[in-house]
């Protein structure tokens, strides 16, 4: 199945033009969501690459703010996006922290039949990111989730490894999928933040908390629709702010908890304890993990 899927559900050199995809919309509407938390340095340039699509391929461009304390909102608005706070997106539900929460709330703040998610910390993103993500959804029957894949450069101490990024993906997510959901081995970037889905799908599945959201959506889609409901598209190169290993370890803990949950395996629910050098001593710090999904949005906002 994996080999066939790579042939007919994976695009390495997609040839769609924006005009082709506009014609393929056939009355469907498209929303683009940028989740953001203190991304003043990059959010404006990401918005600027998508704004030219407004009024044509894209009907709605929203930055969903997760409580930024910098100039994220100011710069996003100046670049041409509508900014919605996590509180305003779903005022009847008190917000929780984390990326999964913001993406879940974005379903209530948008109206598109198709929703594309793009991370707001990207550096020099290709203006074709969104069109490529939309391609399979607009041109192929039965596809409900499209994942982007790409080369991921990593900068460390001034040096760059052209393919060294995606450390949590390569060290945690893909090995675990090989063990627990081997059918998803063919998905190159299971944790990638650039993806698109139909509202029909996204509002019918739970959203995992924090950085578990991407792996949760992927496994839930596979369990509901099989590989034929998923596609992937080559977006070229994706560069963003590289995070320190301490942050990636906390992220990994949430990814593991979510994947175990989706596979019916009990997780301890115990947070990750990390030890930080302090002179000759080591100071423990604990980062929490959450096992509490948000319910399908259709249970709160039936369409």
UniProtKB/Swiss-Prot annotation:
InterPro entries listed in its UniProt record: Glyco_trans_2-like, Glycosyltransferase_2, Nucleotide-diphossugar_trans
Residues bound to UDP-alpha-D-glucose: 35-39, 66, 99, 119-120, 211-214, 238-243
Residues annotated to bind (2R)-3-phosphoglycerate: 166-169, 242
Top-rank lineage group of the source organism: Bacteria
Residues that hold Mn(2+) according to the record: 121, 240
Cofactor note: Requires divalent cations for activity. The maximum activity is observed at 20 mM of MgCl(2).
EC code(s) of this entry: 2.4.1.266
GO MF entries: glycosyltransferase activity; metal ion binding
Cofactor(s) the protein needs: Mg(2+); Mn(2+)
UniProt keywords, alphabetically: Glycosyltransferase, Magnesium, Manganese, Metal-binding, Transferase
Reactions mediated catalytically: an NDP-alpha-D-glucose + (2R)-3-phosphoglycerate = (2R)-2-O-(alpha-D-glucopyranosyl)-3-phospho-glycerate + a ribonucleoside 5'-diphosphate + H(+); (2R)-3-phosphoglycerate + UDP-alpha-D-glucose = (2R)-2-O-(alpha-D-glucopyranosyl)-3-phospho-glycerate + UDP + H(+); ADP-alpha-D-glucose + (2R)-3-phosphoglycerate = (2R)-2-O-(alpha-D-glucopyranosyl)-3-phospho-glycerate + ADP + H(+); GDP-D-glucose + (2R)-3-phosphoglycerate = (2R)-2-O-(alpha-D-glucopyranosyl)-3-phospho-glycerate + GDP + H(+)
SUPFAM superfamilies: Nucleotide-diphospho-sugar transferases
Cited function: Involved in the biosynthesis of 6-O-methylglucose lipopolysaccarides (MGLPs). Catalyzes the transfer of the glucose moiety from a nuleotide sugar such as UDP-alpha-D-glucose to the position 2 of 3-phospho-D-glycerate (3-PGA) to form glucosyl-3-phosphoglycerate (GPG). It can use UDP-glucose, ADP-glucose and GDP-glucose as sugar donor substrates with decreasing affinity and with 3-PGA as an acceptor. D-glycerate can only be an acceptor with ADP-glucose and at a very low rate.
Oligomer and partners: Homotrimer.
Protein known as: Glucosyl-3-phosphoglycerate synthase
Organism: Mycolicibacterium smegmatis (strain ATCC 700084 / mc(2)155) (Mycobacterium smegmatis)
Gene: gpgS
């Amino acid at each position: 199945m994996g080999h066939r899927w790579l042939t007919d559900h994976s695009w390495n050199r997609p040839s769609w033009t924006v005009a082709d995809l506009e014609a393929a919309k056939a009355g469907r509407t498209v929303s683009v969501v940028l989740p953001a938390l203190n991304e003043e340095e990059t959010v404006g340039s990401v918005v600027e690459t998508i704004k030219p699509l407004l009024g044509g391929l894209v009907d709605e461009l929203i930055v969903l703010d997760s409580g930024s304390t910098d100039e994220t909102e100011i710069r996003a608005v100046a670049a041409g996006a509508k900014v919605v706070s996590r509180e305003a997106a779903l005022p009847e539900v008190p917000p929780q922290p984390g990326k999964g929460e913001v993406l879940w709330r974005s379903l209530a703040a948008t109206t598109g039949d198709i929703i594309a998610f793009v991370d707001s910390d990207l550096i020099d993103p290709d203006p074709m990111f969104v069109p490529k993500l939309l391609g399979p959804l607009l041109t192929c029957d039965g596809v409900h989730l499209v994942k982007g894949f790409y080369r991921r450069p990593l900068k460390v101490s001034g040096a760059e490894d052209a393919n060294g990024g995606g450390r949590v993906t390569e060290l945690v997510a893909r090995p675990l999928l090989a063990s627990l959901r081997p059918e998803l081995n063919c998905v190159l970037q299971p944790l990638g933040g650039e993806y698109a889905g139909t509202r029909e799908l996204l509002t019918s599945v739970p959203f995992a908390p924090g950085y578990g959201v991407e792996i949760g959506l992927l496994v839930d889609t596979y369990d509901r629709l099989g590989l034929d409901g998923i596609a992937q598209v080559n977006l070229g190169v994706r560069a963003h702010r590289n995070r320190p290993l301490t942050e990636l370890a906390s992220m990994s803990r949430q990814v593991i908890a979510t994947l175990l949950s989706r596979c019916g395996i009990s997780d301890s629910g115990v947070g990750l304890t990390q030890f930080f050098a302090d002179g000759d001593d080591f100071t423990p710090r604990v980062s929490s993990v959450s096992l509490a999904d948000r319910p399908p949005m259709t249970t709160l906002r039936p369409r």
